[in-house]
């Protein structure tokens, strides 16, 4: 799919396990992982990919009702599930998370890395929004927890759906507060 295809063009996205994928295309070099190839997608295509993967992840993790443990069934074209015992309808959720470009007084940006990542993989800092917490409070908390600094000049940049597992990433910039040594 591309942004040049007419609105209403039918598209089908499927999440395949390795065996299914290799039966369609045996050359593993022709398959792309979203974390590596997603940057080259248009906004529309990235959104569709994220939506499909988030829904697939949600379905896989909600086969049973969280209230009573009974099996659930897919309803509403895959946009919901229903508990087969209680009839309760379950809907996919979106977990808000902030991702922050933290900039110091010399206009340097702070990058972090996780021990489980491959060597030389870096990212700006991110964390989920806690229940009852504002987005700005999340930025302030996360920058203090991860970098040990207080921040100012918090500015919202934009958002993007992210299917790991079903997040809405809310991007911000923030500055290290000027009265701190770092």
Labelled PLM ranges:
Residues 28-31, 43-47, 62, 122, ...:
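Generic signal for short, ordered secondary-structure residues
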Residues 2-40, 129-182:
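Unchanged
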